[in-house]
Amino acid sequence: LELEGLVLVIPRKGAEVADIKEKSLRDVLEVRKALEELSVQLACEKITKEEIEELKEAAETFKKAQKTKDITQIAEADVHFHDIINTASGNQKLIQLLNNLREQMYRYRVEYLKNPEVYPQLIAEHEELITKITHHEKQEATKIMCRHIDNQVEAVTDVIRTKKV
């Protein structure tokens, strides 16, 4: 956890959760953005009808989760949505890289999801992604995924700047 920047180990004191830093946020989300762009492009080419149905179900689960106001449940539903796209890419190395980033991204995702004002936008982006992936519209799906992650960067950066996370 220390190597991933999630925990600070303080000699003779123990460990504490590391603060989210803007630079760290940008670094992690730049990598995520590049990997998720590739993932959505490959998913547009390879997704099966079953995976499309799973994606639709995951989007519905996300909608239901956001009504609970349980941040953990909402974050897990969002992770599951993205996992289906990643699996549909069919690229095991890509999936592995995204899974390796998951813990680092989770903190940022949680901060982002603490603001219920972002939910309608997320739901719309998920629905747009499903439509574009279903119709194999690679360029449009990539644009939506980029916007989706850029919005997260912007929202979490605002949180970092206005308060200590």
What are these regions (language model features)?
Residues 2-8, 101-103, 117-119:
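Mobile beta-alpha loop/short-helix "lid" or hinge segments that flank ligand
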Residues 28, 32, 40, 46-111, ...:
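Conserved amphipathic alpha-helical segments that form helical-bundle/coiled-coil interaction surfaces
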